[in-house]
């Protein structure tokens, strides 16, 4: 869309470039993923990694040690500033892949309809593993997206991370957009409540 392209242009992201947003805790697989991303960027023109401030920025700074100096220029890193929610949403809509954390950002990323990876908040008893798998089941995630989630969330070795490619992103986008459509087709909550009250009265 025009708004999406305008956002990308403002941030120096060209047509045909791949833009990836990163809003995470400390993913166990981050060093492996950054090394993989720099060794084989998904876009032939340019790949941009938009890193949110705070924990994501700190963990990326540490993990970049795993990327050989000769490859560090293969991906353009953008250090983002704190921003209000509407601007965060604009970024989600404008990126080709959104790696998000927490439930609020997951919902926002689903509405954006772009490929997404969810870093679920880790719980000490690993209860989040079942929760993540339940989400992936609902999403009807293809095997590659499920494998990425498992490695990203420490449920599988980092070596099992699938490489990000244009074909993979297309498959993931189709999955997310189908899930978004299912949500849009739901009866609005107020109508569900009205029907419930009518049925009980």
Predicted regions and their residues:
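A conserved mid-protein helix/loop that constitutes part of the nucleotide-sugar donor-binding site
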Residues: 27-36
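A donor-sugar binding/catalytic signature common to diverse glycosyltransferases
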Residues: 84-131
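Nucleotide-sugar donor-binding patch of glycosyltransferase catalytic domains
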Residues: 115-156
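C-terminal amphipathic helix plus adjacent low-complexity
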Residues: 4, 11, 141-201
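Catalytic donor nucleotide-activated moiety binding site of glycosyltransferases and closely related
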Residues: 45-81
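A nucleotide-sugar donor-handling region in carbohydrate enzymes
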Residues: 1-27
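Short acidic/polar capping segments at secondary-structure boundaries
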Residues: 25-28, 55-57
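Domain-scale detector for complete catalytic domains at protein termini or as standalone homologs
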Residues: 1-9, 35-39, 43-47, 53-55, ...
């Amino acid at each position: 869309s025009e708004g999406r392209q305008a956002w990308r242009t403002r941030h120096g992201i060209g047509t045909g470039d791949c833009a990836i947003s990163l809003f995470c805790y400390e993913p166990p697989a981050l060093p492996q993923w950054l090394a993989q991303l720099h060794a084989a960027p998904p876009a032939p023109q340019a790949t941009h990694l938009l890193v949110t401030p705070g924990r994501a920025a700190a963990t990326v700074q540490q993990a970049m040690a795993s990327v050989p100096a000769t490859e560090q220029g293969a991906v353009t890193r953008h250090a983002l500033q704190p921003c209000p929610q509407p601007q965060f949403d604009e970024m989600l809509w404008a990126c080709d892949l959104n790696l998000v954390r927490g439930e609020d950002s997951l919902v926002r990323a689903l509405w954006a309809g772009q490929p997404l990876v969810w870093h679920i908040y880790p719980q000490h008893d690993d209860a989040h593993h079942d929760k993540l798998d339940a989400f992936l089941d609902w999403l009807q995630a293809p095997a590659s997206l499920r494998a990425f989630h498992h490695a990203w969330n420490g449920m599988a070795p980092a070596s099992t991370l699938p490489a990000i490619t244009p074909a993979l992103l297309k498959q993931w986008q189709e999955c997310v957009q189908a899930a978004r459509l299912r949500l849009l087709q739901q009866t609005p909550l107020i109508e569900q409540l009205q029907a419930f009250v009518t049925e009980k009265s």
